[in-house]
Amino acid sequence: VSGVEISLNWDGVTDKLPEGIRVIFYPKDGEGKKVDRYLSVRGGEMKVPPGRYSVVAYNYNTESIRIRGEESYETIEAYTGNCNGLGITGTEKMVWSPDSLYVLNIDELKIDKSEEVLSLDWKLESVVKKYSFAVEVKGLEYVTAIVGCINGLSDCYHIGKGYGASSSQPIYFEVKKDGNKVVAYFTAFKQAKEMSVPTRISESRSAISRGVGDIKLILRFIKTDNTVQEATIDVTEIIETLEDAGIGDDGKQEPPPEIELPPDDKIEVDKPELPPN
């Protein structure tokens, strides 16, 4: 068994370090044996039998992200669970926004039989993107709550293969009223490196067509009489502009980018027929 010393560098990746890292060595062609360890956020030493491996590393103990398919490099993926427990009709089909996920994947790494420890310097990459937006809405005085979701962004991430995919589950987010606008912040997994649109997964989870998916923001306005009015905004063309600018030079959160709707598409919440009791 050979010693492998892993050093993790977080410079330029994040200031908020995760709790720790899980590293899995998957043997290729039956050479070697699967090794699965939890390391500190700075890394650590692992004992790995000589052989050829595919490797993944990611931060564990995330709040909303779960892992499935961890039996192989090809199948391991991150996803988020359904929004049960919100008590709002329709949200149980939605999934939570992912929290921070940092990932490294190596297709092939050869571990030789050696007395000397092999040193590996790794830098993980963030695979969750932040988005925000503001949009003007008329009639907000009739609204008691707003449920938001985005359809068509990546709701899962293939850690070994290194790309996000959409299984057509809407990602839920909270929407707040701010004067005559509504404002929201949400996250989704990164798409594949070379594509700006997510890969679509078929129901059988096998055939994958990399077709352009429409990306839609859906806002559901719950009114004072408990009726619901829905507005859909197609953001396929502008999704890149909604990527969160983050914190400005003055240390303040940048204001969310405004979505300019054409005059015919302005969102207006109709006055409820019944006065609230």
Whereabouts are the PLM-identified features?
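Hydrophilic extracytoplasmic domains
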Residues: 203-277
